[in-house]
């Protein structure tokens, strides 16, 4: 909540980019709840899938977040909770979410001839309305060039096809983008994390209740971060929640082991 109000305070910048990224934070919270709580499974699973579909509907490339289904399947099998799958399949909202997902793909298909535009391998070139594959590739390369710091309102790099390949772009990206936007964002979340750490830190450990899924979810986030950094390293294309969550989750896991009795007592006293 604090993060959203500090870093996403300008409503004019929200659009579909910021809104989807706010929902990603909620999605991770609901994922942890779904994995760790046996009660209210139907309600928790409903919230998770509604959030997931909403995120994908706002930006099609967030279809990559379907990878977060893996921790659910893993722990259902590991903890022998397959019985929950039956309850899940009886939930009409599951089928509504699935149909919504199919509808999103169809809308993309009828608009561009691609299931996910501008990803060339998802395009069907045999239909009359399909955008020519060369134009799809050019648009994809343009988005990649822009996100890698190779283009802006007043400049373009030479040889963009070579620039976006492998890690040729990293040096220039650090100069024109990292130290303008990413570094400020990192300073902000590190400072916010420090403030919250100081407020909630306690030397008294409490009886630890292990939270399942933290490590596996963290690995999924690292995979998503790697894909983000290699293909479209702009904060507006999913960087905000990935960077923040990679920092917040370990801190939250550490602070969850502490006893907040003294902190709560002081708050009540004031």
What does each model-found stretch correspond to?
Residues 1, 6-33, 238-240:
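Multi-pass, polyprenyl lipid-linked donor-dependent membrane glycosyltransferases
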Residues 1-4, 27, 47-51, 98-99, ...:
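Transmembrane alpha-helix segments characteristic
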Residues 4-12, 78-79, 111, 201-205, ...:
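Juxtamembrane "helix-exit" motif on the non-cytosolic side of transmembrane helices
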Residues 8, 44-60, 64-71, 99-102, ...:
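Membrane-interface alpha helices of multi-pass inner-membrane proteins
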Residues 9-12, 159-217:
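Membrane-interface anchor segments at the N-terminal boundary of transmembrane helices
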Residues 65-98, 254-256:
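Perimembrane helix-loop-helix junctions
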Residues 91-183:
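Membrane-lumen/periplasm interface segments of specific transmembrane helices
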């Amino acid at each position: 909540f604090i993060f959203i109000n500090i870093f996403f305070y300008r409503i004019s910048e929200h659009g579909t980019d910021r809104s989807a990224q706010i929902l990603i934070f909620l999605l991770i919270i609901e994922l942890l709840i779904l994995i760790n709580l046996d009660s209210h499974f139907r309600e928790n699973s409903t919230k998770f899938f509604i959030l997931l579909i909403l995120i994908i509907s706002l930006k099609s490339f967030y279809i990559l977040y379907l990878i977060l289904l893996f921790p659910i399947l893993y722990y259902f099998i590991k903890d022998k909770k397959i019985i929950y799958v039956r309850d899940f399949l009886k939930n009409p909202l599951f089928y509504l979410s699935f149909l919504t997902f199919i509808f999103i793909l169809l809308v993309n298909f009828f608009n561009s001839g691609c299931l996910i535009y501008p990803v060339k391998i998802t395009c069907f070139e045999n239909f009359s309305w399909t955008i020519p594959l060369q134009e799809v590739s050019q648009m994809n390369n343009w988005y990649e060039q822009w996100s890698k710091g190779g283009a802006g309102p007043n400049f373009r790099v030479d040889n963009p096809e070579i620039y976006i390949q492998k890690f040729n772009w990293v040096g220039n990206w650090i100069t024109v983008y990292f130290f303008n936007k990413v570094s400020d964002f990192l300073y902000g979340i590190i400072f916010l994390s420090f403030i919250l750490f100081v407020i909630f830190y306690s030397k008294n450990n409490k009886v630890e209740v292990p939270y399942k899924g933290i490590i596996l979810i963290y690995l999924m986030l690292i995979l998503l971060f790697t894909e983000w950094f290699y293909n479209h390293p702009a904060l507006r294309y999913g960087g905000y929640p990935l960077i923040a969550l990679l920092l917040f989750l370990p801190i939250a896991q550490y602070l969850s082991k502490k006893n907040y009795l003294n902190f709560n007592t002081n708050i009540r006293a004031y």
